[in-house]
């Protein structure tokens, strides 16, 4: 396995670790509605950081974006909005199926759809089937899916042991939402594929290869921001128990505390895709679709490890932890299989 591929896998792991940890600061926010907290974090992660970093990278910010036609920018934006819809469905999936089943189904579907639809759309799927390296990477995707399933099973055992149930368990509604979440969340993978002309243009301007994908985040995350912020602001305006004014009428130290923690959560959320861009840059072009598989499977892996570190699995017994550990090992094996396949 080449150093470039190894570093690509490593950066995807770092990004996934940030994704697995980003919600920790949000949990310490006090006396704010989820909508206000999510909006503040989202403004940081979807608007302020993408725009600021792009302004630092590009020699002429406005000239860069104005150089693209609407036919180039619109698909990137719409796929970003598609991913934003997946974000909202994610929370509803947890509500009706519970954390473990919801995450397992949603992540499993988005892993498959986001990974395999890109080569199918680009007309390259036959290359994967007809080459040794392609078949090896497909095997890695399958093994990763098995690993996600094992970790999901561990989560179910944990919830059963701890007596945790879905807020409003509804299998039919939950499955529909999980499928929708999985499909729509893959919009980020599709957006990265559609943004290739933007990456090439950034490279032509002398932007370091590790950073060429970052300017496209202004458009991708702009689409996601409109969906997420629109959802939050509508709820803040219409739901009687929610009030943006009330959230910002708290004592000043508490407001500062909440803003800083929400901003930190937003920063950590953004860093997952900052390092995703680094990993994506190191993956061979013919296998760039594998970036999504690495990100999603590592997200599940890191989520399990973070849970162990935070002692969330204490008092659950040996079996859930053993199953979780097995799932994590399978995901690590999958990453190695994919790496070997790309090297071939």
Swiss-Prot record:
Source species of the chain: Shigella sonnei (strain Ss046)
GO molecular function: rhamnose transmembrane transporter activity; symporter activity
Name of the protein this chain belongs to: L-rhamnose-proton symporter
Compartment list: Cell inner membrane
UniProt similarity note: Belongs to the L-rhamnose transporter (TC 2.A.7.6) family.
Reactions mediated catalytically: L-rhamnopyranose(in) + H(+)(in) = L-rhamnopyranose(out) + H(+)(out)
InterPro entries: L-rhamnose-proton_sym_RhaT
Function text: Uptake of L-rhamnose across the cytoplasmic membrane with the concomitant transport of protons into the cell (symport system).
Positions of transmembrane segments: 4-24, 38-58, 68-88, 101-121, 137-157, 175-195, 214-234, 259-279, 290-310, 323-343
Keywords, sorted A to Z: Cell inner membrane, Cell membrane, Membrane, Sugar transport, Symport, Transmembrane, Transmembrane helix, Transport
GO cellular component: plasma membrane
